[in-house]
Amino acid sequence: MDLTPREKDKLLIFTAGLLAERRLARGLRLNHPEAVAYISAALLEGARDGHTVAELMHIGTTLLSRDQVMEGVPEMIPEIQIEATFPDGTKLVTVHQPIA
């Protein structure tokens, strides 16, 4: 299977996001990389499901709460930017203050 660097990046994000999802399900608090991966993977999947950029910008702020991440993590993630593939092309999705 030949994957482009971009496809490899998306696969890595998805895998890390899946790991974070499993840890959340076990009641563990996510660290910085896990939180970023969890939100990023959800945004990529949301774009694939047909959500708009504006919808994803809102959804991205509702995925994790302070209680679900380790202390200090919300302050370490002022924003998340990810290029997602939409039906009409690739667009940059920016989520400000993703963990409120």
Curated annotation (Swiss-Prot):
Pathway: Nitrogen metabolism; urea degradation; CO(2) and NH(3) from urea (urease route): step 1/1. InterPro entries: Urease_gamma (IPR012010), Urease_gamma/gamma-beta_su (IPR002026), Urease_gamma_sf (IPR036463), Urease_subunit (IPR050069). It catalyses: urea + 2 H2O + H(+) = hydrogencarbonate + 2 NH4(+). GO terms for cellular component: cytoplasm. Its main location: cytoplasm. It is an enzyme of class 3 (hydrolase). It is found in: Cytoplasm. It holds the Pfam family Urease_gamma. Belongs to the urease gamma subunit family. This is Urease subunit gamma. The gene is ureA.
